[in-house]
Amino acid sequence: MSPLSARSPRETVAFSAQRFPDHEALHIPLQACADFSPQPVSLTYRELDRAINEVTTLWQGTGIAGRVALVCENRAEFLIHWLALNALGLSVIPINHEMPDQEIPYYLEHGEAVAVCTLAKHLERFTDICSSNELDIPVVSCDSISSLNLGKPIEQPAPDPDAECALLYTSGSTGKPKGCILSNDYFLEQGHWYRAQGGHIELRDGRERLLTPLPLSHMNAMSVSTMAMFSTGGCLIQLDRFHPATWWQSVRESEATALHYLGVLPAILLALPESDGDDFSGQIRFGFGAGVNPAHHERFERRFGFPLVEAWAMTECGAGGAIIASHEPRHVGTCCFGRPGKPIEWQLVDENKKPVAKGMPGELRVRARGPNPKKGYFSGYLKNPEATEEAWLGGWLNTGDVVQELPDGNLIFVDRRKNIIRRSGENISALEVEAAVSDHQDIQMAVATAVPDELRGDEVALCVILKADTVDPKTTAESIQAHVLEKLAYFKAPAWVIFSSSLPVTASNKPKRADVKTLALKAIEEEGAIDLRHLKKRTKSV
């Protein structure tokens, strides 16, 4: 048997349990589990397989039929209950426990959850949420599944690659989050894709130990990390979250050979004091992620001794449209994410969906090559056929990401189309502005957004969290603008600067850009923003 013949994530684990029964499948370092375990959590493939079988039997006896919401953090319980339900042909709705109470009912109602399975410490909270919102949904803890009685025991069906495996919600810039229906095949293709890349991210069967701090409630950790390891007999090293102070300790003690990251991680790690133990070239083979600040990329690799391999993907495209710079040249420091592989058809288009001239930026559209252009992609948005049709307008997945092709065929990320600031006919990337101010001595975090301007159409507003309060906001704002002008053309500099003690972010610490824009507009309206428009002059270009 081979993972390549698996028909579901559960079957993938079963196959690896036969090939590598005594290899470690899951490891949670002590730094990530100290509040519930006196020692690191460790499960071999044999132990994980047995635990899944035991929990599958418990769920069978409940008579469950429908989606189950999982509130299990980045714990072994998440994987065990997800895969047990997967064995029964049932889907899960991962819920981030850090989500505010008022947001949770939407996910339970829209996703039509028939039960909530949670860690014991969240049981009372989620019971109260369901009760106060008049949701007739039973809530059980992971260790009391047998108390649930929803009908006659159910049969275990044969695995179906096309069956729904999970419902993951993606937050859009407007409106409610959309539920992405992800099939078993979606997850299987993630493992196949990772195994096929080679180059810097080549996976060695039974030998890799992949560390990730990302939440299992998101696509990267739930589908990419898990399937990469489970399909190769590797070990998933799952942190509860990113802990800068103990990050390298976790890396060393867990004997990680690879790691996954978000763009903010390298910046934070580079800010830590240098030490004699910074060189990980003898241990870590690669980092896999997206969004590293171009100014940090080469510095990070030189200091820590391993490549940060940039990739592009989105929940909707899965592995079907994923692209990664796993082979040279990687064009370090340019936001390059590689050359599309042969299984992918792609094009760059303008706002009218017409192909742009070679070398010009345009929206990336992707689809699978062959008879099924949606192979490896999401199955659609739950209860939203209009949005699904819009996503696949013209027979392509319209990603909304603005990308540029280099002469050698590699692609570089410019920005999300909705993050492009259009000022007097110039297209300005919010990410480019943010990168330009990231090393300003006073800035902890900065997010750029477009605000309306009667003369220019859009102007650049920059919302900033300072490392310490300033006694002279105007001078500090001017210093920030001057810092940008040293690096970018004058029209890209912030016209408005808004200081705030906090900015809205997602669970993975990405800015909630729609909320940031609302904050900026309100600050300007209420005269709480610093107006620097008069200082934007055509005196210098870079």
Model-found features: residue ranges?
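AMP-binding/adenylate-forming catalytic core of the ANL superfamily
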Residues: 99, 370, 379, 387-390, ...
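Conserved C-terminal "lid"/linker of ANL adenylate-forming enzymes
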Residues: 421, 447-453, 461-465, 481-542
